[in-house]
């Protein structure tokens, strides 16, 4: 039986590459930077241009499909995940990196049916790395199969996380406290690349052993989550329970041993869900 969603995935790869070309051209030029929820929550005309390009192209080919896009939500649309085939799009994951020309910027596309992710595409466009995964068929970077690391000892692990966009003193204290707890276990190190999607792809490659973050959105992780699991890794809620795409929090690790240890150490930061008003 033919894969009903393979054509959609092939189209997503084509669109991600086209979007990446737009991003890589724009990063060379002066930018009009705007603010969203705070002085550090940035958006550019390129974010909006790329999302509009992606959604309009997909709508033309698949008019019955649904969409959740970062900039559409910022403009007032709802993040509602239904059973309908849904494209979950982050046109530029790592906008702050993009603004500063820090070279980790990704176009991220996740595709869900019946609320389950069927495939993910993450194009780290400055690096020229195309990460892809189809449910049940493995994860790849530029055609090379990915495999998570085999590390089970957290004291020998390399973690990735982000400080996030909140500058509320209480939240910042909790973020730094969580990092301190993990750092002092001790772990080999903690890194921050500046994009959730690339952080998760680094776990999929085996370059990092685990990633955790609270404050992300569904479009940050929809594409990369399946890349982690298809590379042999796990997704988990920061409480140690099942991962929930709309919860705004995730642990992505090479195995349950590291994921559960991270969940045990960190304090949960209260957040409004993506699907709540």
From Swiss-Prot:
Entry binding sites for Mg(2+) 2: 90, 93, 220
Keywords in alphabetical order: Cytoplasm, Hydrolase, Intellectual disability, Lithium, Magnesium, Metal-binding, Phosphoprotein
Pfam family, one: Inositol_P
Entry binding sites for Mg(2+) 1: 70, 90, 92
GO MF annotation list: fructose-1-phosphatase activity; glucose-1-phosphatase activity; glucose-6-phosphatase activity; glycerol-2-phosphatase activity; identical protein binding; inositol monophosphate 1-phosphatase activity; inositol monophosphate 3-phosphatase activity; inositol monophosphate 4-phosphatase activity
Chief location of this protein within or outside the cell: cytoplasm
Reaction catalysis annotation: a myo-inositol phosphate + H2O = myo-inositol + phosphate; 1D-myo-inositol 1-phosphate + H2O = myo-inositol + phosphate; 1D-myo-inositol 2-phosphate + H2O = myo-inositol + phosphate; 1D-myo-inositol 3-phosphate + H2O = myo-inositol + phosphate
Subcellular location: Cytoplasm
Domain of life: Eukaryota
Keyword Disulfide bond carried by entry: no
Ways its activity is controlled: Activity with myo-inositol monophosphates and D-galactose 1-phosphate is inhibited by Li(+), Ca(2+) and Mn(2+), but also by Mg(2+) at concentrations above 3 mM.
Enzyme class, first EC level, given as a word: hydrolase
Disulfide bonds: none
Biological pathway: Polyol metabolism; myo-inositol biosynthesis; myo-inositol from D-glucose 6-phosphate: step 2/2
EC number(s) recorded for this UniProt protein: 3.1.3.25, 3.1.3.94
Annotated positions of the Phosphothreonine modification: 168
pH dependence: Optimum pH is 7.0-7.5.
Alphabetized Gene3D superfamilies for the sequence: 3.40.190.80, Fructose-1,6-Bisphosphatase, subunit A, domain 1
Effect of residue 36 to Q: 50-fold reduction in activity
GO biological process: inositol biosynthetic process; inositol metabolic process; phosphate-containing compound metabolic process; phosphatidylinositol biosynthetic process; phosphatidylinositol phosphate biosynthetic process; signal transduction
Cofactor: Mg(2+)
Family under the similarity heading: Belongs to the inositol monophosphatase superfamily.
Assembly: Homodimer.
Protein role: Phosphatase involved in the dephosphorylation of myo-inositol monophosphates to generate myo-inositol. Is also able to dephosphorylate scyllo-inositol-phosphate, myo-inositol 1,4-diphosphate, scyllo-inositol-1,3-diphosphate and scyllo-inositol-1,4-diphosphate. Also dephosphorylates in vitro other sugar-phosphates including D-galactose-1-phosphate, glucose-1-phosphate, glucose-6-phosphate, fructose-1-phosphate, beta-glycerophosphate and 2'-AMP.
Protein name: Inositol monophosphatase 1
Native organism: Homo sapiens (Human)
Species classification: Eukaryota, Metazoa, Chordata, Craniata, Vertebrata
């Amino acid at each position: 039986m033919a894969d009903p969603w393979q054509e959609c995935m092939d189209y997503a790869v084509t669109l991600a590459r086209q979007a990446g070309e737009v991003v890589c051209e724009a990063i060379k030029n002066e930018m009009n930077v705007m603010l969203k929820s705070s002085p550090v929550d940035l958006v550019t005309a390129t974010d909006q241009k790329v999302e509009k390009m992606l959604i309009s192209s997909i709508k033309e080919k698949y008019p019955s499909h649904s969409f959740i896009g970062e900039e559409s939500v910022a403009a007032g649309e709802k993040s509602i995940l239904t059973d309908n085939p849904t494209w979950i799009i982050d046109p530029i994951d790592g906008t702050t990196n993009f603004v500063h020309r820090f070279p980790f910027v990704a176009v991220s596309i996740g595709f869900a049916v019946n609320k389950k992710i069927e495939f993910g595409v993450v194009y780290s466009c400055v690096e020229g790395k195309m990460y892809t995964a189809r449910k049940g068929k493995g994860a790849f970077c530029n055609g090379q199969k990915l495999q998570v690391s085999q590390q089970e000892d957290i004291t020998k692990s390399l973690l990735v996380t982000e400080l996030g966009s909140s500058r509320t003193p209480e939240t910042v204290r909790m973020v730094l406290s969580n990092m301190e707890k993990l750092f002092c276990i001790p772990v080999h190190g903690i890194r921050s690349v500046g994009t959730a999607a690339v952080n998760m792809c680094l776990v999929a490659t085996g370059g990092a052993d685990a990633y955790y973050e609270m404050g992300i959105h569904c479009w940050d992780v929809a594409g990369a989550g399946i890349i982690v699991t298809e590379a042999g890794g796990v997704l988990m809620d920061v409480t140690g329970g099942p991962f929930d795409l709309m919860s705004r929090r995730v642990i992505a690790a090479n195995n349950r041993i590291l994921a559960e240890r991270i969940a045990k150490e960190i304090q949960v930061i209260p957040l409004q869900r993506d699907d709540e008003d």
